[in-house]
Amino acid sequence: MSGNRALPFAAIGSGGGSEDVGSTRRENAMRESDQTDPDEIVTVLLPEDENTHTPDAAENYNESMYLNVFDLGLEVGGWFRLGNRVNEGHAEMSVCIYLPDGRVGFMYDRPKIDNNDAMDAGGLTITVVEPFEHLTVTYEGRVCLLDDPSEMADPRAAFGTNPMVDCSVRLDYRAVSPMYGGRPQYADGREIETLNGFAKAHYEQHCSVIGTITVGDAVDVDVDGRDGVVMEIDGMGLRDKSWGPRYWQALTWYRWLPMVFNENFAMMLSVIDRGIRDDGSARTPSASGMVLVGNEYHRVTDCRIEADWNEAGEQTAMRCWAQTDEREYEVTGEVLSMIPLRSRRTTPDGNQLHTRITEAMTRYECDGHVGLGMSEFLDQVVDGWPIGVPR
């Protein structure tokens, strides 16, 4: 899966809840179409957007990069995220490794930063070698090795009772798809207000991935009597980038399903509930995504994600339907390994907000193909229960 091939430079971008396809040469901004209405929303993406941006004045400005990886032969995976919150003086650094025996290695840190010059904090470094084509991920540090990943629902206890082991990551990402997304703006160049939103810009791309992930000591026996694990990765993954003001509590819930089958077939399905409008009316959850067919993205015009749940309200399986202009898809998913994470924030008036994010490596099947990916479910927790999960 490690091959690289030339690709058309195209994007599927979102604006105002709708998405359209556009393409252009590399050196130009990508816009969905020539607009005459200055209030029309277009999507722009430039090669320099792969670099870090000058932070907005908003206290909650976030610039983040996320990359996942899955090796279908080894049935292992992982994901890596670095979010610079320079106006708050720290980054958010996450490393998550799904081991072949069901254990999970996880680390979260908030290393101090005083600038937004690079994606490099807490031992995790994400480097853009060539915009839209080639990135690398390295990590040198520790992870908490969990026999039972569900223990991370109480992170203080999980980090206090499970062993910390060395972890080394060296991964090389090469594009196998066009770009998806960008920065929505008005056609006349005005920015769209996102102070209380989730991000003002976001894009994604499927990649081939090769490299090595080592968890524990590869030679000696680790603290719980098992050898360390060395995984020579030859697989695929999805990467994304976001920037702009972000609170994890800005959305009511979402379901995000990136998945890979082979270099010619991959997809991402997303359903987002943004809650109640200012006038008190309910918003309809928005569906979006893309399907990689060959070296082209087909826009998802509609999709549904139904899930089975365990007693903790965590996803265990999925049945999905997606529609593109070309055809319909049915996808099933089975959770292989899941770790629950959380984000908490106190509002200026003293309200305690609690967000749960369940991060599950998931086996997917579609059209006779078997693949791997994530099922990432975010929910605000209200009265002790995730709001988008049926009781």
List where the protein language model places each region.
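Structured soluble/peripheral alpha/beta segments that form catalytic or ligand/cofactor-binding pockets
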Residues: R26-R391
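Short, Lys/Arg-enriched N-terminal segments with co-localized hydrophobic residues
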Residues: G17-A29
